[in-house]
């Protein structure tokens, strides 16, 4: 009897232990509240009731969160966010996303892994760590023991650089729309615009002044880092910067977080979080017309006047309907017109290649003979000829009539669409008219058949004109009455 009671008590303890273990694991996996670390065995799926961001992990100060970010309503990306910042500080590969559904699963097994069979997405840190943590500076890390970092998000920036984060020559900041990027050169920071699938255009450059330290050949590439004292520093070796790009908060004691973002208009802006709001702290490009494409394709940006179209005839924002892809102007199927205009200059000309010609005609001829050339801009004073070998974007409007532009404008998608639309519309009207005609003929034919059948049933008696009263059938009726 005592053995039976002991066995029953043992079974109860075992069941209680199993329940506690599995209930603890279930709470950890499906907890709504974010935790301070994720350990091996963690799993999570997106919650269908959440419409923006589902936090899974937070830093110890509660300023940053890591979790599922809902993108375009039905898509999902892994992201690190700040509660008072509209856009995330870090996003896992913005060119790829998973579906926001129960099929998507995130887990940590030493590697951070996300799988979505429906989108054929499978990503992993390929590590063998013990924990996933979020540092107080927003750095997401896979760590082994307490000190060894096997993977960190700071090595894979998106469009944001955070205070004290190293930005190396192997990295790039990319704007959310994918059109602009920031990279390091041998002794400078450069901003680039994607002007076609094959090429990029340099549009902003900040070279190191090398006042306190010099760039040394063979000493390795430079790196950039936001200093808490309010500047973006460039370094090569040691802690002495080869350049200091000052923010508004430069050498002012502030208690907050500094970030630098490459935004969708191509500008590089710095922000300061002071504990209550984000304040603009830096702008690389101060003038609107110095941005890479402020007015759109085939347009002019004139300082103090705003945007206009190169041909002076179309509505702003619709200066052309032409495709923004490269073209072969030597192909006979490529239709285009030529627009000439004075008071035009290429933007960021200091960063563009040029050739010297003796006349405008010679400059134009160089573009005419080049099958890939979209336009040429000529300075009659210096003789500089700038060839634009990509779809025309925003040009710079100037008051100097000696600066002349020659542009090839393709017969655009809009015109072709209008022709197609007109053809479709006319065809539709013709079909409707044909259907109505057939319907009218059919109805007329049915009425004629009906009347003919009635006449045959009545032996030819039918209401008709007065002159028919003299017919043979009518006379026979009268004779019978007599």
Swiss-Prot record:
Record-annotated disulphide pairs: 363-385, 367-373
Entry keyword set: Disulfide bond, Membrane, Signal, Transmembrane, Transmembrane helix
GO CC aspect terms: endosome; Golgi apparatus; membrane; trans-Golgi network
Main location as per UniProt: membrane
Domain PAN residue range list: 330-411
BP-aspect Gene Ontology terms: recognition of pollen
Residues passing through the membrane, by range: 425-445
Signal sequence extent: 1-31
SUPFAM superfamilies in the record: alpha-D-mannose-specific plant lectins (SSF51110)
Family matches, as PROSITE patterns: PAN (PS50948)
Source organism, top-level taxon: Eukaryota
Compartments reported by the entry: Membrane
Membrane topology: Single-pass membrane protein
Name of the protein described by the UniProt record: PAN domain-containing protein At5g03700
Organism from which the protein derives: Arabidopsis thaliana (Mouse-ear cress)
């Amino acid at each position: 009897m005592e053995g039976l009671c002991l066995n029953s008590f043992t079974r109860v303890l075992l069941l209680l232990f199993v329940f506690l273990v599995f209930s603890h694991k279930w709470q950890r996996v499906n907890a709504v509240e974010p935790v301070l670390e994720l350990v091996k065995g963690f799993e999570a799926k997106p919650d269908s009731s959440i419409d923006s961001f589902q936090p899974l992990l937070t830093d110890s100060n509660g300023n940053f969160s890591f979790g599922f970010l809902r993108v375009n309503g039905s898509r999902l990306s892994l992201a690190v966010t700040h509660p008072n910042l509209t856009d995330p500080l870090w996003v896992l590969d913005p060119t790829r996303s998973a579906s926001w559904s129960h099929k998507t699963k995130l887990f940590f097994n030493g590697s951070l892994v996300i799988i979505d069979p429906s989108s054929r997405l499978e990503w992993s840190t390929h590590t063998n760590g013990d924990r996933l943590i979020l540092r107080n500076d927003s750095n997401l890390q896979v760590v082994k023991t307490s000190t060894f970092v096997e993977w960190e998000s700071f090595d894979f920036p998106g469009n944001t650089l955070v205070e004290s984060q190293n930005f190396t020559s192997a990295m790039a900041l990319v704007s959310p729309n994918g059109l602009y990027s920031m990279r390091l050169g041998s002794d400078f920071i450069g901003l680039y615009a994607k002007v076609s699938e094959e090429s990029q255009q340099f549009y902003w450059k900040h070279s190191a002044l090398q006042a306190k330290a010099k760039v040394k050949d063979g000493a390795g590439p430079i790196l950039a880092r936001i200093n808490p004292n309010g500047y973006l520093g460039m370094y090569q070796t040691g802690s002495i910067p080869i350049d200091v790009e000052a923010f508004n908060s430069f050498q002012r004691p502030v208690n907050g977080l500094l970030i630098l973002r490459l935004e969708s208009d191509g500008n590089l802006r710095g922000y300061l979080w002071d504990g209550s709001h984000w304040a603009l702290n830096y702008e690389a490009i101060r003038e609107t017309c110095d941005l890479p494409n402020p007015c759109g394709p085939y347009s002019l940006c004139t300082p103090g006047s705003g945007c206009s179209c190169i041909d002076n005839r179309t509505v702003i924002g619709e200066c052309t309907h032409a495709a923004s892809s490269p073209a072969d102007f030597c192909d006979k199927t490529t239709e285009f017109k030529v627009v000439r205009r004075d008071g035009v200059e290429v933007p960021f000309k200091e960063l563009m290649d040029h050739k010297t010609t003796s006349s405008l005609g010679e400059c134009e001829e160089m573009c005419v003979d080049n099958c890939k050339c979209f336009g040429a801009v000529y300075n009659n004073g210096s003789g500089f000829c700038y060839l634009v070998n990509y779809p025309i974007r925003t040009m710079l409007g100037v008051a100097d009539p000696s600066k002349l532009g020659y542009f090839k404008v393709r017969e655009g998608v809009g015109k072709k669409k209008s022709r197609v639309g007109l053809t479709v519309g006319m065809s539709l009207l013709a079909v409707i008219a044909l259907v109505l005609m057939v319907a009218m003929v059919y109805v007329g034919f049915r009425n004629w058949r009906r009347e003919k059948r009635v006449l045959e049933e009545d032996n030819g008696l039918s209401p008709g004109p007065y002159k028919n009263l003299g017919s043979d059938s009518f006379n026979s009726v009268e004779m019978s009455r007599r």
